[in-house]
């Protein structure tokens, strides 16, 4: 239960910092932290496969895409600070409506706020998974990835590595004052014409 509350508190604080952070890059990093804490909650619930898919899809694809888009757009933070106050009333009204909807959704017979007369007889079920000795989802997936489909797994990893390096190259700021090496030009140089013996 302690880990559950730790993940919940970190997810809520990170979600608030996504909105409150002044730097857009910091907002994306806090969003990644929200996804990681949510994956921790899914692991505690026994949904290990969903936790892994959550990390792969949201953190590995969407959050990294947001990060590179923010880095490439050259967002001016000063303009964002000037326009923050004009959106506060509308944001406050939307937040209050959302909070009211949460209370209306939770306060019912199935999910009461105060469990005084909770009768969970309709929620009882029998778990047959614990009665059969079998592998977990992660063990089965790992066994298939690293034995049967290991070649495809390596190829997909190389493709992701090339895409990551390409995104970093695209977001680099090219200036005239910075000295860089051009490997293609260096390899294409004819050393017989450049190096001469001096007697």
UniProtKB/Swiss-Prot annotation:
Q: Which enzyme type, at the first EC level? A: translocase
Keyword flag Cell inner membrane: no
What GO terms fall under cellular component here? mitochondrial membrane
Coiled-coil stretches noted in the UniProt entry, renumbered to this chain: none
Q: Which InterPro entries does the record associate with it?
A: NADH_UbQ/plastoQ_OxRdtase_su6 (IPR001457), Nuo/plastoQ_OxRdtase_6_NuoJ (IPR042106)
What's this protein's function? Core subunit of the mitochondrial membrane respiratory chain NADH dehydrogenase (Complex I) that is believed to belong to the minimal assembly required for catalysis. Complex I functions in the transfer of electrons from NADH to the respiratory chain. The immediate electron acceptor for the enzyme is believed to be ubiquinone.
Full protein name: NADH-ubiquinone oxidoreductase chain 6
Species of origin reads: Marchantia polymorpha (Common liverwort)
């Amino acid at each position: 239960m302690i880990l559950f509350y730790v993940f919940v508190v970190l997810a809520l604080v990170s979600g608030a910092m996504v909105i409150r952070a002044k730097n857009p890059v910091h907002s994306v990093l806090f969003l990644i932290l929200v996804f990681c804490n949510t994956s921790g909650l899914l692991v505690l619930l026994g949904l290990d496969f969903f936790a892994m898919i959550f990390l792969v899809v949201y953190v590995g694809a969407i959050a990294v895409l947001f990060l590179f888009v923010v880095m490439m757009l050259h967002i001016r933070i000063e303009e964002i600070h000037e326009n923050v106050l004009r959106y506060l009333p509308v944001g406050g009204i939307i937040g209050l409506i959302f909070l009211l909807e949460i209370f209306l959704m939770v306060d019912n017979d199935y999910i009461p706020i105060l469990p005084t007369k909770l009768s969970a007889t309709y929620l009882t079920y029998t778990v047959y998974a614990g009665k059969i000795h079998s592998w977990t989802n992660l063990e089965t997936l790992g066994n298939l990835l690293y034995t049967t489909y290991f070649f495809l797994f390596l190829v997909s990893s190389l493709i992701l590595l090339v895409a990551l390096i390409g995104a970093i190259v695209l977001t680099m700021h090219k200036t005239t004052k910075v000295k860089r090496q051009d490997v293609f030009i260096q390899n294409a140089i004819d050393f017989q014409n450049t190096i001469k013996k001096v007697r």
